[in-house]
Amino acid sequence: MISVKLSKRFKKTVRSAGREQEVSETLKLVIEGFGNSHAHTGLSIRKLGRHVYECRTGLAWRLVFVADKGVLSFDFAGDHDEIQNYLRGKR
């Protein structure tokens, strides 16, 4: 069973963008399909680094999460440029 953690930053970003419903639906699909490559092809889950992944909620918005021992920790959400800036700051 996979569990999910949402950071304060993630929750705040999603809330301020008004994308709660969209993100909630995507999180359900990620929980169901993570680790099963055929199930998550529609979500566009991509590995960005060691244990770091992103998935799309739509064409323009993405969610960044860390996968570690059955826990998916979502830390950031945004468009392509925002994700790139976030990842540069993580290195």
Task: Please state what every model-predicted region is.
Residues 1-5, 12, 53, 57-62, ...:
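Enriched for short, Lys/Arg-rich terminal
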Residues 29-56:
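A short, surface-exposed loop/turn module that caps and links secondary-structure elements
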Residues 16, 37-38, 79:
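Alpha-helix capping and helix-coil boundary motifs
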